[in-house]
Amino acid sequence: MAFRDGDGWVECICGVRHWGKHGAAGILLLRDNKVLMQHRAEWVQNGGTWGIPGGACDSHESSLEGALREAHEEVGICAEEISVIRIEREAHGDWFYDTVIAHALDNCYPFAANDESQELQWINREDVAQMNLHPSFARNWEKLRANLP
């Protein structure tokens, strides 16, 4: 993994250290009634938990660009394989996490493209909350789920 200008910690006004000097973004990928979940490698922040592909945005990237770059790096997908629905923002004043909600098109075949993932699984929406979720994703899952198409 190459160093990027967005890599680094932010001491947030909420009292939590967040990864991403310029904010962060991830992709919540939908297929039928399932979402793509990433079992995070043990060596990453909150390793061993489940979440969505994502990470720090660089200074020159929009949150959509950052989420797409991270999705390509982590799960091997590109913009032509998804249809973006909308972006949901979790704002903390001086830091943000944007979740790009998108449908996986028929030509979308995610795979663990780097060592940040132990595995990927398509999980039924109603089963996600029972998983050992990344703490930030766990806090936001019900709000995200309630607004899914």
Label each PLM-derived region with a short phrase:
Residues 28, 36, 99-101:
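Ordered hydrophobic segments in well-structured contexts
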Residues 1-26:
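Acidic, metal-coordinating catalytic segment for phosphate/diphosphate chemistry
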Residues 19-22, 30, 44-45, 92-95, ...:
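A generic fold-level signal
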Residues 55-149:
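Unchanged
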Residues 5, 31, 90:
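Acidic surface patches and DE-rich sequence motifs
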Residues 17-19, 49, 65, 85:
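Catalytic phosphate/metal-binding cores of nucleic-acid and nucleotide-processing enzymes, i.e., regions
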Residues 30-74:
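Conserved Nudix-box catalytic region and its N-terminal flanking loop in Nudix hydrolases
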